């Protein structure tokens, strides 16, 4: 894990050959949806382990079948709220809950509109109560403009103030990180890798495309048929 010196509390994993290999597969346009989803699950699980390394531990005494010895517990691991941004973050959440099995889960459906406005539409929110002992992990694979995450994090604040607010993603653009840190300087950002920037449509470059479409298939738009009213 590498601390990026451009910002406070921003970390990437360029130093991990294992994660870089998974990311390479995700970037490849020929990777199918099954492999793509599995890759996201793996990254969520591994990055969850890395987050645990930053949590407080407490030494305890236990009895083995042979004698007394000393061990540890990670106290904060049981006070985690994972907020998933539908739909692309679902595999990330699957990986995270393998590490934080006691986590409470929040679900937010939020999507970004087209350039140049990039307006955010949020139409479903289910978030549990958040306490001052909680670590909130907001999972969203792509931190592009940061607009979606800022909207979600503003919503999260209505449910309480956590001990830690963590954003977990796969790829990030500097533009998105800048906007998040301006609005939420206390936020910690963990991403597999930070890419060079955005194109005119707000996509990360070199990126990996639309994570939701690649994980679950591109949605189709069904035309709305006119309603026919009959008169008895």
UniProtKB/Swiss-Prot annotation:
5-phospho-alpha-D-ribose 1-diphosphate binds at residues 87, 112, 140-148, 210. GO terms for molecular function: GTP binding; magnesium ion binding; uracil phosphoribosyltransferase activity. Keywords: Allosteric enzyme, Glycosyltransferase, GTP-binding, Magnesium, Nucleotide-binding, Transferase. Gene3D superfamilies: 3.40.50.2020. It comes from the Archaea. Allosterically activated by GTP. InterPro entries: PRibTrfase_dom, PRTase-like, Upp_A, Ura_phspho_trans. It is an enzyme of class 2 (transferase). Binds 1 Mg(2+) ion per subunit. The magnesium is bound as Mg-PRPP. GTP binds at residues 38-42. Uracil binds at residues 204, 209-211. One of its GO terms (biological process) is UMP salvage. NCBIfam families: PRK00129.1, upp. Catalyzes the conversion of uracil and 5-phospho-alpha-D-ribose 1-diphosphate (PRPP) to UMP and diphosphate. This is Uracil phosphoribosyltransferase. It comes from Thermococcus sibiricus (strain DSM 12597 / MM 739).
